[in-house]
Regions:
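N-terminal leader/targeting pre-sequences
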Residues: 1-111
Length: 111
């Protein structure tokens, strides 16, 4: 199963792909963003995909189907949508690749 998010507006040209080979396999997440300030930026999935407002007021909270606490990618009981940080280079771009079993592309908890 594969899903793609395309970022428009402030993140013009950004994308993120999600690939999961089977319901029990981890999700491979990779992508590219641009026009961000250099340094670390939190990377997470929100409940809704509406990013028309730059302050994320239309996005809802972090994806959290099990009502866990906020945390990092490595915290066992954090929001499913908490995917850690990405590091943006001085030119405002970042590429990222990770694997996680905290999210799924299958079933009722699918992103």
């Amino acid at each position: 199963m594969k899903g793609v998010a395309v970022f428009q507006g402030k993140l013009k040209g950004g994308y993120c792909t999600f690939i999961q080979d089977s319901p029990k396999s981890p999700v491979k997440v990779n992508g590219h963003v641009q026009n961000l300030s250099p340094g670390k930026h939190g990377f997470h999935i929100h409940t809704y995909g509406d990013i028309r407002k730059t302050d994320c007021t239309k996005c809802g909270g972090h994806w959290n189907p099990r009502n866990n606490d906020h945390g990092s990618l490595t915290d066992e009981n954090s929001h499913a949508g908490d995917l850690g940080n990405i590091v943006v280079r001085d030119d405002g771009t970042a590429d990222f690749n990770l694997k996680t079993s905290k999210i799924t592309l299958y079933g009722k908890e699918s992103i």
